[in-house]
Every structure is written in structure tokens, then in C-alpha cells.
UniProtKB/Swiss-Prot annotation:
Pathway where this protein functions: Metabolic intermediate biosynthesis; chorismate biosynthesis; chorismate from D-erythrose 4-phosphate and phosphoenolpyruvate: step 2/7
Enzyme type, top EC level: lyase
Role summary: Catalyzes the conversion of 3-deoxy-D-arabino-heptulosonate 7-phosphate (DAHP) to dehydroquinate (DHQ).
Organism encoding this protein: Salmonella arizonae (strain ATCC BAA-731 / CDC346-86 / RSK2980)
Subcellular location per the Swiss-Prot or TrEMBL entry: Cytoplasm
Protein name per its UniProtKB record: 3-dehydroquinate synthase
Cofactor binding comment, as recorded: Binds 1 divalent metal cation per subunit. Can use either Co(2+) or Zn(2+).
Chief place of localization: cytoplasm
Designated gene of the protein: aroB
Stretches that traverse the bilayer: none
NCBIfam families, per database record: aroB (TIGR01357)
Cofactor: Co(2+); Zn(2+); NAD(+)
Binding site for NAD(+): 71-76, 105-109, 129-130, 142, 151, 169-172
Length: 362
């Protein structure tokens, strides 16, 4: 069992990583006998895990209700959020309730925002079931729902009480979802840890076949890196923005193509290549390192080009709604070398559009 602490003073919390955690009531601390819980999951995961998690909590004396939501990025919306509020109010659940997010990034983000908003804030626990949510979205307290004009535009910073990562969940993960998660894994190597990127080049095949020790190390290292960044910059005033490598481009793809048509990790993968190409054009990133990124993404089964039906010009309106934009100026996370990156403003639209166009045609 691995345990990592996200250090935020009185709001610090543990990330527990191991196989078989759904069998142990102690995995779901700080829950205790007599507590009231609303388990939030989706219709795909409910048949796989709902009874198991509900059962282990009930054996610990926890009172459990549940709400099952439709599955997919398009349902990360205010309308579906209201479904959670309605379920909480009908019981009713008070301020002493705990929301448990049992699912991937959509469930985690939506449930976290529900917890931040319901009666001005209740406790919640992240139980991520996808690789992407285990290494990224469940850690750090970013919660949100989408708006038709932009991804994650309505949300709050709100930290969980704990994160429970059961490695056994990956056994039921479709190959496309596994690849999507690997995009965020690769991101950490590009922006923060050159040694980890090199390790990924040597161990990607083991991750693709769900080798236990390799996957445990991979998730632990990603969570360590994320925890360090969040502890230093919880509200994304500086360092934490680096975690958005590829996301400004990727969110544009998701919004333009329709939420769910491109998985988040797929869009981020293409976006990271666009960011690398932009940095190349500015003379601050090598072509050789761009090719290393492209090669690793391809081995993971991820796209390295944007959708052909989306013109370069179609990106800009979405990118200019990005949360990093200041005074109307586009700010991008750009790699400087494998393991090193920066947030840069003042990049001309012409340079960005040229990089996008080349990535569309490559």
C-alpha cells in the first residue's frame, strides 16, 4: 500500500493507492459508524462497483444512499448537477453528510462541485476508477461542470477529505480509456520530471498490459508530483498552471467537436503536440524532443494530430475563453525541454495558428 499526503495545513488529506481497497472499510477514512453518505456514480460503473462499495461502508456502520447518473462528458452539466442536489434534498441530507465520488473525472468533478455548493460545503471523498482520474483529476480540489461555451467554466477549488485509488478498477477499464489516462501520465514527464519520462519510454508496454508493480509506481509518481504542485500553489496562481500543458488546445477540441466525441486525454495528447510545435517555432524547444513526445503518445495509442474537420481558426475562440487568459491575452503552457516547462504570454496568434495547422496536416 502506498500513501501520499497532499499538504495543505488543516485541509491536508491522504491519497491511498493499492489493490483491493474496496474490500477494506478502513480505506474510506475519515468515514465512521453512524455517518451519512451519498454515493454518486454512473450507470456504467454502478453494476461493477456500487454494491461492493456500499456493502463495505454499510458493514462499517455507515448509512448509504446513492444516485446513479448517465455516463459521459456531455452529462457534466448544470442539469445533471441538479439531479445530485435533488437526491440530497429528498432524503434529506444535512451539512454533516459526505459525498463519495465513485467514478472517473466526470463523476469526480461534478460530485466535488456538488459538495462545494450543497449547503455551502459538505465533505467529500474521491474514489477514482479510471487511470486519468487516479493520476490527475481526483487530486488537487479542482471541481467543475461544463458550459456549452467552455469546459470546466463553472466550478470551485474544493479539496476532498481523502482519495482512494483501488488499482483493481483498471482491470475493467476499456483500452481507449486507459490510453486517455496515459496522456496525463506522459504530461507529468514532459512538464516536471525528465527521469519519469525516460522511465515511461522504457515501461510503457508494461503499463499497457496493466503490470501491477509498474502501474503502482506510475500512479504513485504522478500523485507525488501533483501533490507537490498543489501544496505549493493550490489555486493556480503560478506553478500549478503547468499542469495544463496541452489543455488550452485540447479543451478547444472537446468544445468544438462536442463533449465526449474526443476523450479528454485524446484531446490533451493532440494539444501537447501543438504546444511542443508552438514552442519549437519560438526557438525554445527541440525538434528531437517533439519527436520523443510524438513517439510515446503514438505507442500509447493516442492521437498526435487534431481533428481534420476542425480548422486552425476554429481553435482561437475557444482558446481565448481559457481560464489562463489575462487582459485578453492568450497564455500557453509550453515545454522548454523534457522535464521543464513555462507559462508564456504574448505568443502571436499567427505562430499558434501555424503550429495548429501543421499538426492538423502531419
Amino acid at each position: 500500500m502506498e500513501r501520499i499526503t497532499v499538504t495543505l495545513g488543516e485541509r491536508s488529506y491522504p491519497i491511498t493507492i493499492a489493490a483491493g481497497l474496496f474490500n477494506e472499510p478502513a480505506s474510506f477514512l475519515p468515514l465512521k459508524s453512524g455517518d451519512q453518505v451519498m454515493l454518486v456514480t454512473n450507470e456504467t460503473l454502478a453494476p461493477l462497483y456500487l454494491d461492493k462499495v456500499r456493502g463495505v461502508l454499510q458493514r462499517a456502520g455507515v448509512n448509504v444512499d446513492s444516485v446513479i447518473l448517465p455516463d459521459g462528458e456531455r452529462y457534466k452539466s448544470l442539469t445533471v448537477l441538479d439531479t445530485v442536489f435533488t437526491a440530497l434534498l429528498k432524503k434529506p441530507h444535512g451539512r454533516d453528510t459526505t459525498l463519495v465520488a465513485l467514478g472517473g473525472g466526470v463523476i469526480g468533478d461534478l460530485t466535488g462541485f456538488a459538495a462545494a455548493s450543497y449547503q455551502r460545503g459538505v465533505r467529500f471523498i474521491q474514489v477514482p476508477t479510471t487511470l486519468l482520474s487516479q493520476v490527475d483529476s481526483s487530486v488537487g480540489g479542482k471541481t467543475a461542470v461544463n458550459h456549452p461555451l467552455g469546459k470546466n467554466m463553472i466550478g470551485a477549488f474544493y479539496q476532498p477529505a481523502s482519495v482512494v485509488v483501488d488499482l483493481d478498477c483498471l482491470k475493467t477499464l476499456p483500452a481507449r480509456e486507459l490510453a486517455s489516462g496515459l496522456a496525463e501520465v506522459i504530461k507529468y514527464g514532459i512538464i516536471l520530471d525528465a527521469d519519469f519520462f525516460t522511465w515511461l519510454e522504457g515501461n510503457l508496454d508494461a503499463l499497457l498490459r496493466l503490470d501491477g508493480p509498474a502501474m503502482a509506481y506510475c500512479i504513485r509518481r504522478c500523485c507525488e508530483l501533483k501533490a507537490e504542485v498543489v501544496a505549493a500553489d493550490e489555486r493556480e496562481a503560478g506553478l500549478r498552471a503547468l499542469l495544463n500543458l496541452g489543455h488550452t488546445f485540447g479543451h478547444a477540441i472537446e468544445a468544438e467537436m462536442g463533449y465526449g466525441n474526443w476523450l479528454h486525454g485524446e484531446a490533451v495528447a493532440a494539444g501537447m503536440v501543438m504546444a511542443a510545435c508552438t514552442s519549437e517555432r519560438l526557438g525554445q524547444f527541440s525538434s528531437a524532443d517533439t519527436q520523443r513526445i510524438i513517439a510515446l503518445l503514438r505507442r500509447a495509442g493516442l492521437p498526435v494530430n487534431g481533428p481534420r474537420e476542425m480548422s486552425a481558426q476554429a481553435y482561437l475562440p475557444h482558446m481565448l475563453r481559457d481560464k489562463k487568459v489575462l487582459a485578453g491575452e492568450l497564455r500557453l503552457v509550453l515545454p522548454l525541454a523534457i522535464g521543464k516547462s513555462e507559462v508564456r504570454g504574448g505568443v502571436s496568434h499567427e505562430v499558434v495558428l501555424s503550429a495548429i495547422a501543421d499538426c492538423q496536416q502531419a
